[in-house]
Swiss-Prot record:
UniProt name for this protein: Antimicrobial peptide ToAp1
A single Gene Ontology CC term: extracellular region
Organism annotation: Tityus obscurus
Alphabetically ordered keywords of this record: Amidation, Antibiotic, Antimicrobial, Fungicide, Immunity, Innate immunity, Secreted, Signal
Origin: domain of life: Eukaryota
Residues the record lists as Lysine amide modifications: K39
Protein's UniProt keywords contain Signal: yes
Taxonomic lineage of the native organism: Eukaryota, Metazoa, Ecdysozoa, Arthropoda, Chelicerata
UniProt keyword annotation of Signal present: yes
Propeptide stretch(es), residue numbers: 40-74
Expressing tissues: Expressed by the venom gland.
GO-annotated biological processes: defense response to bacterium; defense response to fungus; innate immune response; killing of cells of another organism
Note: Negative results: does not show antifungal activity against Candida glabrata (ATCC90030) (MIC>400 uM).
Amino acid sequence: MQMKYLIPIFFLVLIVADHCHAFIGMIPGLIGGLISAFKGRRKRDITAQIEQYRNIQKREAAELEELLANLPVY
């Protein structure tokens, strides 16, 4: 990411954090992200995260079906 895009985003987050104190905890992560972007680190592998999310959804659906199958019918 280029510097001209990162600086306005950083200032926008600072303005939001000034108005909403819930975003204060987000500032250290943002600074770390900016440092990583300047060092040129690659983005995380999104495909692995998507696959992990799908596996969790399948597991939760199977657990829900098993739970509903074990409930008595009234």
